[in-house]
Curated annotation (Swiss-Prot):
Protein's UniProt name: Mitogen-activated protein kinase 2
InterPro entries to which the protein is assigned, alphabetical: Kinase-like_dom_sf, MAP_kinase, MAP_kinase_CS, Prot_kinase_dom, Protein_kinase_ATP_BS, Ser/Thr_kinase_AS
UniProt entry tagged with the keyword Nucleotide-binding: yes
Short sequence motif TXY: positions: 191-193
Post-translation changes: Dually phosphorylated on Thr-191 and Tyr-193, which activates the enzyme. Phosphorylated on Ser residue.
Organism of derivation: Arabidopsis thaliana (Mouse-ear cress)
Modified residues (Phosphothreonine): 191, 196
């Protein structure tokens, strides 16, 4: 539970109160009443809370020492920029970014999201029975959210069960946009690509220069297979083993299906693998719906140019009972959203831009802290 504590050094900042959860200090706006910690990651701790002004339940993520690691700081900035613009019922909503007290010295960032009950990873590994209706509805919502994200020219690049939040009535929302990129920037953002290997598309494993929205479709296929089988379909131990597992199930590929590989060394490796006849998905998932298997086969295709698109997947007969094209308008997002250019930023500019994001949620602070806020 959340334990009230005195502020550090006995100095209480205006509009803040202080709590300890899992040995972590939370300095949060007084309108939020923390309940209990609900998650922990490399970034810090997440707690559930209530906004006493709106009576809404929210999740507060504290990112500790955000500037300690430049890559983590960039991920946080990217999340802030994107979620301020993305508005869709299958994308987690960022409700607030708490205003830091001092622009030049703040170290921690507090993000306030809508509260969800669990994530798809927890559901898959639980004993909860997953019917065809469950699998169909989860997949539909994932594809629907992804269609919206792609319509904003954004690649998520880190789709996995743990990044899909779920609540008790099976509503699903995509979260964690720290690795997202715009899809009109090609072949220049591999530097910190650390997406979970098991869900990584072949074109990324094979170090191809050009890739697009189909990388997210591959990840969706891996997640769908995991829903059907209750375990990862390609649980590789390292990169080469990951490729080997993929070929083992998909089968050895024809020459024309390897033309997308523009890395000669990677192509030679694929061609050197022993012949595999492949394993049919209907054999791997004998209890699955026939249409589900057909859609899965179209998602998990090695050549990205032959992989089904998100829109085509939503129009597939397996999704037909749920999909209404008129209910899926494209995202209204600025086309110059510059999340890719951030990689060259220095620490002070990252700090400046984070402060700017806070100001979007607290415009009154721009005048109150007039002496600290530069013109944007």
């Amino acid at each position: 539970m959340a334990t009230p504590v005195d502020p550090p050094n006995g100095i209480r900042n205006q509009g803040k109160h202080y709590f300890s959860m899992w040995q972590t200090l939370f300095e949060i706006d007084t309108k939020y009443v923390p309940i209990k910690p609900i998650g922990r990651g490399a970034y810090g701790v997440v707690c559930s809370s209530v906004n006493r002004e709106s009576n809404e339940r929210v999740a507060i993520k504290k990112i500790h020492n955000v500037f300690e690691n430049r890559i983590d700081a960039l991920r946080t900035l990217r999340e802030l920029k994107l979620l301020r613009h993305l508005r869709h019922e299958n994308v987690v909503a960022l409700k607030d970014v708490m205003m830091a007290n001092h622009k030049r010295s703040f170290k921690d960032v507090y993000l306030v999201y809508e509260l969800m009950d669990t994530d798809l990873h927890q559901i898959i590994k639980s004993s909860q029975v997953l019917s065809n209706d469950h699998c169909q509805y989860f997949l539909f919502q994932l594809l629907r959210g992804l269609k919206y994200i792609h319509s904003a020219n954004i690649l998520h690049r880190d789709l996995k069960p743990g990044n899909l939040l779920v609540n008790a009535n099976c509503d699903l929302k995509i979260c964690d946009f720290g690795l997202a990129r715009t899809s009109n920037t090609k072949g220049q953002f591999m530097t910190e690509y650390v997406v979970t290997r098991w869900y990584r598309a072949p074109e990324l494993l094979l170090c191809c220069d050009n890739y697009g929205t189909s990388i997210d479709v591959w990840s969706v296929g891996c997640i769908f297979a995991e829903l059907l089988g209750r375990k990862p379909v390609f649980p590789g131990t390292e990169c080469l083993n990951q490729i080997k597992l993929i070929i083992n199930i998909l089968g050895s590929q024809r020459e024309e299906d390897l033309e997308f590989i523009d890395n000669p060394k990677a192509k030679r490796y694929i061609e050197s693998l022993p012949y595999s006849p492949g394993i049919s998905f209907s054999r791997l998932y004998p209890g699955a719906n026939v249409l589900a298997i057909d859609l899965l086969q179209k998602m998990l295709v090695l050549d990205p140019s032959k992989r089904i698109s998100v829109t085509e997947a939503l129009q597939h007969p397996y999704m037909a009972p749920l999909y209404d094209p008129s209910a899926n308008p494209p995202a209204q997002v600025p086309i110059d959203l510059d999340v890719d250019e951030d990689e060259d930023l220095g620490a002070e500019m990252i700090r400046e831009l984070m402060w700017k994001e806070m100001i979007h949620y607290h415009p009154e602070a721009a005048t109150i802290n007039n002496n600290e806020v530069s013109e944007f």
